[in-house]
């Protein structure tokens, strides 16, 4: 664009040309004016440039006069101000009137159209430059032609109202022109796309992209196109990013002296570097963006570099970042502190509420206790009964359980319950009414018993219920037992059976060991089996289920007294068997057999030695005296007596009989008769079988040795038949016995398989049954939540397959076999 019309001289400028670079309305109007005056550069101007000489005709319009320019003056530019439009500069009224009269001579349609831009353009004026009018009659001349174009399109498949193309993708409406708002260049006023264009082609075209790039470049119009410094790119760091990054390690406070000043020479790079601390050496590989105060190394030297200012700015930035981080930490700390204090306040509020409730409950409990103390006074008109006191304790246990557990129940029961309990049992006779008071004591056991074990009366932490029994009930029982006669055992045994579930283990042991056993021991010492009409087992055996092994010290003196009584005994006296028979299951097998061998077997042997065998007139009383002891005396002892004192005489009588022409039929009957006198258990013994088989052999030899002599007809056959019959019976008996043994073994196997213990408790129970040991739970007795059991006299509990036995001060684990040995 030519700017020569802006050069001129002012009156005060001393001939210095001034050029204004501002874009005026004249520039905008004549930029797109095809009829503007063009200045063609001459040869001289091309050669000499601005120093070329110009003719007066070639002078460009300017605001200055026609005087010649002073080229010796320095070049200077002055502001031209706001230039008026070219149409307003024409002030020659003659030329205007001439031009107006000339235009009126032309038709209106052929009048030259002025290019309207900006505010002079109206949307209603839809005319093109050059006089062509755009209206609905455009192309109407085609109505008077043959319309060959429309026909050709229809032959090619065109359908009116649809677009062109295979898929009718062409536009239907004609291209719509959009008039620019102002007088600027194309795109100066934004996108010039019409609504139809946007609808048909919604994709942004390259012109719009170029428009965006142009607007971006226009914002940097002050920079030179190809040189200068590029636009700086600013990176912004939000507070959230700074918090997330948490640059904790950068301390921008006053630099502290390092613990050790060490000079470090770094020769790992291309150049030798010296550091004065290990921290500086550790920061040498830091990323430039991460290290404080270190800028990015510039490839080109900076023309305007202020390192001190940059350092200070970076220092301010780091200090601000650290302040933000510290403030965030402080805020987080305060928020956490608020949360903690809130929780603490809630907890303290709950504690305060619980304490208030506890104070209220304790006040009510105290009032109730004071009321009970007032009513137990002798001068009270409404005395407290034991039933009412039990209901009060139940109410305290139900409504104020925590306070009831925390209270000293022992002191409370001593002060209130003991006087009432003494008054309740003052007229009671346990031997007459053994069940009296059991329901009352059962209720008080549930109210006062705490569950921990008390082992003796000297235990400092004695259970209140145990203390109640020990201090009130046991002294009363001592007086009753002191007057009790052991031979009248039934009332006392029934009484203890009724109270055993209410008595603690240690109190029951104390009663049995300190009160009952001494009375029994003294009575056994005074017992005389020869003069006493009451059998001793009648007043000793009722205590066996309860005392069990506690009575073993009494068995030895009882056996001694019985032995002394049997010294002058004869087997013909059957009373001895009646006295001894109840003790067979009480004494141990070894002690019982030893007692029989010492006191009974010699007497029976003496009777058998005096026994006379006479086939013609046999007396069986002596033999029956011996066989009656078969269940009392061991089988081996009975067989020994028969082998020693009976069968030698019996075989001798048989031989004598066979040597005197006997009647074999009578001998056979005699043989079978004696054999029927023995039980199957005795006959099954091998020694007894051998003796009877020996008798058969003697009979067979006697028959076979009498060849040629006179013999009873059929005797040999009869003896042979008897022999075969006896052998067959023995074989059948042995087979039957083997079958019974096999069946019993199978039954034991099935029973054992069916009785396989499911847990350790079942195993202990099965072992107790095998060894005849009482194994039963102690009702209401627990230790650390585990049920306590009574294994004979031993108190045990089971924990995860291990048996714990109660010792003197603690619980001791033990094996099952050791437990069985201890119980025996």
From Swiss-Prot:
Region named Disordered: 1-135
InterPro entries: G_patch_dom (IPR000467), GCFC_dom (IPR022783), STIP/TFIP11_N (IPR022159), TFP11 (IPR024933), TFP11/STIP/Ntr1 (IPR045211)
Pfam family, one: TIP_N
Keyword Nucleus: yes
Family recorded in the similarity comment: Belongs to the TFP11/STIP family.
Assembly notes: Identified in the spliceosome C complex.
Name recorded for this polypeptide: Tuftelin-interacting protein 11
Source species taxonomy: Eukaryota, Metazoa, Chordata, Craniata, Vertebrata
